[in-house]
UniProtKB/Swiss-Prot annotation:
It comes from Cercocebus atys. One of its GO terms (molecular function) is cytokine activity. One of its GO terms (biological process) is positive regulation of immature T cell proliferation in thymus. PROSITE patterns: INTERLEUKIN_1. Potent pro-inflammatory cytokine. Initially discovered as the major endogenous pyrogen, induces prostaglandin synthesis, neutrophil influx and activation, T-cell activation and cytokine production, B-cell activation and antibody production, and fibroblast proliferation and collagen production. Promotes Th17 differentiation of T-cells. Synergizes with IL12/interleukin-12 to induce IFNG synthesis from T-helper 1 (Th1) cells. Plays a role in angiogenesis by inducing VEGF production synergistically with TNF and IL6. The record marks 171, 179, 181, 190, 204 as: Important for interaction with integrin. This is Interleukin-1 beta.
Length: 269
């Protein structure tokens, strides 16, 4: 079997005469001017540099060829070293790391958002300008009459909730529910006339910030007096009669025979 000859003058011809520049390229002998002391990966188009050690000149030609072949394969695999990483380089990497997907904002409609808003409420009693108190008369009716002594406990305690409505400097939208009862004052049209009634509601859904308009009253305070105007029927007010023990109703006149002025007394919860 033929033996591969030792590398001698053929290989030495590739070497530089400068001991500090002992390099050669796979593409052929060439004297290199760069120092191998600061070695980095080179660009693909810059060739491959090898350092030849003085202590290994006697290596066989077979080993030298193996090194050249191995380095030639590596040259096809190596990638150029990037420059110093900058902040703006991140923007070019992000599209490869993250997959962009559209984000759809699930906005709720105004009604749903308002329904979830907390409702501020207070407890109070109402008496008309003649100091008549409001009491229950039957399951769905209020009457106004004078109460004395222990009878005062019969007066209705309202849960006044501050709700959404056409608020202004002198008008505050409220809803008037009966404390500890599932009843609210509401204004509806009966026989073509605005009418005040007590309406039963589901306690799971009431009170809420956006009440139906029939439940809303514009609270108007003037000189420590209180008026409650229907939001459903403007210029119609919660009213009482001059007579004793008469139903509370919705009246269309102010300052006349019907009483529309009330005083409000707060009640602790």
């Amino acid at each position: 079997m033929a033996e591969v000859p030792e590398l001698a003058s053929e290989m030495m011809a590739y070497y530089s005469s400068n001991e500090d520049d002992l390099f050669f390229e796979v593409d052929g002998p060439k004297q290199m001017k760069c120092s191998f002391q600061d070695l980095d990966l080179c660009p693909l188009d810059g060739g491959i540099q090898l350092q030849i050690s003085h202590e290994h000149y006697n290596k066989g030609f077979r080993q030298a060829v193996s090194v050249v072949v191995a380095m030639e394969k590596l040259r096809k695999m190596l990638v150029p070293c990037p420059q110093t990483f900058q902040d703006n380089d991140l923007s070019t990497l992000i599209p490869f790391i993250f997959e962009e997907e559209p984000v759809f904002l699930d906005t709720c409609n105004n009604d749903a958002c308002v329904h979830d808003a907390p409702v501020r409420s207070l407890h109070c009693t109402l008496r008309d300008a003649q100091l008549k108190s409001l009491v229950m008369s039957g399951p769905y009716e209020l009457k106004a009459l004078h109460l004395q002594g222990q009878d005062v406990e019969q007066q209705v305690v309202f849960s006044m909730s501050f709700v959404q409505g056409e608020e202004s400097n002198d008008k505050v939208p409220v809803a008037l529910g009966l404390k500890a009862k599932n009843l609210y004052l509401s204004c509806v049209l009966k026989d073509d006339k605005p009418t005040l009634q007590l309406e039963s509601v589901d306690p799971k859904n009431y009170p809420k910030k956006k009440m139906e308009k029939r439940f809303v009253f514009n609270k108007i305070e003037i000189n420590n007096k209180l008026e409650c105007e229907s939001a459903q029927f403007p210029n119609w007010y919660i009213s009482t009669s001059q007579a004793e023990n008469m139903p509370v109703f919705l009246g269309g006149t102010r300052g006349g025979q019907d009483i529309t002025d009330f005083t409000m007394q707060f009640v602790s919860s």
